[in-house]
């Protein structure tokens, strides 16, 4: 049998551009540069310990244990991935600036390179704590429009709601490397052919099922959850004998890219909600380069993304590294959790069902 003729990422972008006769082509160039950065990172991840890239990054004193702006220990691959994104994307003339999880301030395009009309924000290596144990990690990115006429970008230029995104996506470095992308017209998945070095369209028009029996949450934080989340998880754990009348499965990988990918493939709901573990942090995940890109993908695939109180893409950012509570996935489940937040009368009073029937029963 003849091989299936698959569309390459380049061909896909050309087809998308044909829908907009006035488009300049610069956007396509930007996405292809992002894809190139992801290819380089995929290669580094694949070599693992053979490439000497496992373990913690060194600080200025040459000691293992460098810390980024988030106060998190950097892995060697965090640093390499960030450098790769900057190097591959700064020269093309498509960007006015970049911002990264690993950098405190926006990155200015060097003067000897032309400036473009877009902004790129990214988490160069999500889930990097999983590197040394060989669990899937990924890169997340979002494309925004830059303000016209500015000679240098500022933090304020990046503080746009998720609804302003031009494109978003992630690369998953797992058994295969995949690039999952939205340009505002659905969600499509591309698989990297390691022999040709090309991404091919393998998962067109991804759709998140509206219903699910699977949820992902870090249950070790259960004592810090707000009442609506406690109620939802308790009902799921009660299974067929509870108010939902069906059994649920729980998943947790500690890599949001891997969690999001599973949900895009087969449905589910992911929760890293606001909690009381650290009152100084209203959430764990970062709005601009983690929550918003995944929210755009979920909404474009028929799912939903929320804080529990409002849609993620309607949140007005207040800072480059702003953290936020995140709930996304199958639409009906996310809307149910939102409804529980709406019904909440006392934020400090958990549902009785949580204590009576949950596996995470509070101590007497």
UniProtKB/Swiss-Prot annotation:
Enzyme Commission number(s) from the entry: 3.1.3.11
Name the PANTHER family for this protein: FRUCTOSE-1,6-BISPHOSPHATASE-RELATED, SEDOHEPTULOSE-1,7-BISPHOSPHATASE, CHLOROPLASTIC
Native species: Cupriavidus necator (strain ATCC 17699 / DSM 428 / KCTC 22496 / NCIMB 10442 / H16 / Stanier 337) (Ralstonia eutropha)
Cofactors needed by this protein, per the record, are: Mg(2+)
Q: Catalysed reaction per UniProt?
A: beta-D-fructose 1,6-bisphosphate + H2O = beta-D-fructose 6-phosphate + phosphate
Give the family per the record: Belongs to the FBPase class 1 family.
Q: Which SUPFAM superfamilies match?
A: Carbohydrate phosphatase
Which is a Gene Ontology cellular component entry for this protein?
A: cytosol
Q: How is the cofactor bound?
A: Binds 2 magnesium ions per subunit.
The name this protein goes by in its record? Fructose-1,6-bisphosphatase class 1 2
Q: Where does substrate bind?
A: 126-129, 218
**Which principal EC class is assigned to this enzyme?**
hydrolase
**Subunit structure, interactors included:** Homotetramer.
